[in-house]
Amino acid sequence: MDELVHRVLAMFADLNDETLDLHTLFEAGGNEPASRERVIDVVSQLVADGLLEERGSDFYALTTKGRVLAGIQ
């Protein structure tokens, strides 16, 4: 699994939250603008793969499949 994908998924467990907004998920990319832009691509791919669900207003939640992959039961 790509390191950035892992960090994005791990943020849900680390922050113990069911939903996170895109600005919080940007932290997975660090401080560099290019890395933060890549977070947008990763989040879009995770939605397309059924691991994240869009909740509106830039909020995202792990799906059941995403929870399993992230190691959250």
Model regions and ranges:
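Short, amphipathic alpha-helical interaction segments positioned at domain boundaries
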Residues: 67-73
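Minor-groove-contacting beta-hairpin "wing" of winged helix-turn-helix DNA-binding domains
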Residues: 58-64
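Short amphipathic alpha-helical interaction segments
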Residues: 32-48
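Short loop/turn and capping residues at structural boundaries
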Residues: 23, 40, 56-58
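A short, conserved structural fragment
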Residues: 47-57
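Short amphipathic alpha-helical interface segments
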Residues: 1-31
